[in-house]
Swiss-Prot record:
Coiled coil: none annotated. InterPro entries: Ribosomal_eS6 (IPR001377), Ribosomal_eS6_arc (IPR020924), Ribosomal_eS6_CS (IPR018282). Keywords: Ribonucleoprotein, Ribosomal protein. It comes from the Archaea. GO terms for molecular function: structural constituent of ribosome. This is Small ribosomal subunit protein eS6.
């Protein structure tokens, strides 16, 4: 059975972390970077989340250009998994495909559409009133 840590980024820069397992985790399996998931999977009813990335149990980042869920060694000029220090530097890096699988441990997501209640209300946060 898969279990994930889902990190949901808000427009204001706040990030919320959720532990997801069981049936809720199955809603993510088979989805790829750029696809949307119902917010009920992480306890945010009425919200819609877009998968923006993630990583596997070894820390390999998900790469949107790699189909499937397998690992691949790519020659990277920069971007996901490698930040060059000099112009023209390239490096072979191992990345995970764009599809969420049982090997995925962390999923990054952003909010596409909001529900009626605020996230703070849903999570039991304190009001500043």
């Amino acid at each position: 059975m898969a279990d994930f840590q889902v990190v949901v980024g808000d427009d204001d820069g706040t990030a919320y972390s959720f532990e997801v397992d069981g049936q809720d985790a199955n809603r993510f399996i088979g989805r790829a970077i750029g696809e949307t998931v119902d917010g009920d999977a992480v306890g945010l009813p009425g919200y819609e989340l877009e998968i923006t990335g993630g990583s596997d149990q070894s820390g390999r980042p998900m790469h949107g250009d790699i189909n499937g869920a397998e690992t691949a060694a790519i020659l990277s000029e920069g971007g996901v998994g490698f930040n060059p220090t000099v112009d023209g530097e390239r490096k072979r890096v191992t990345v995970r495909g764009a599809e969420v699988s049982e090997d995925t441990r962390q999923i990054n997501a952003s909010i596409v559409s909001r529900g009626e209640q605020s996230i703070d209300d849903l999570l039991g946060g304190e009001d500043d009133e």
